[in-house]
Amino acid sequence: MASFFDQVYLVVQQIPPGKVASYGQVAAILGSPRAARTVGWALASLRESNEADVPWQRVINSQGRVSIRNLRHAMAEQQALLEAEGVEFDARGYVDWRRFGWDGLSPVELEALLADS
C-alpha cells in the first residue's frame, strides 16, 4: 500500500482545474479526518520534480484562504496559479466554497484509485 504522503498526492491529482479542496477534506477522504496538518506537510514535502504532477495549489485552508508556509512558494504565487485556473478570490482573499469547492471522491472512487497505485 502507498504511504500516506503518496495517497495525498493521488487524491490531490484528482482535483480538477478551477476547483479547490481543504487540507481537512483531503485527510477525510483518506479516512484520517484529523490529519489535515499531515496533508500540509505532504504537500510542503513535494520535490520540485514532482510539483508539475501534483496540483498542490488547489489545496487551501478550510476558511477558503491560501495559507502556504513554504519557503519555495509565496502565498501570492498560489493565489495567482488558482486565478489562472479560473478560481476567484474576494477582496479579503477568500474563495467561495459553493462555486469552487471540489466535491471529492466517493469511497468506491478512492478504493479504485488506491488499487491502481
Predicted regions span which residues?
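Nucleic acid-binding interface residues in structured DNA/RNA-binding domains
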Residues: 1-117
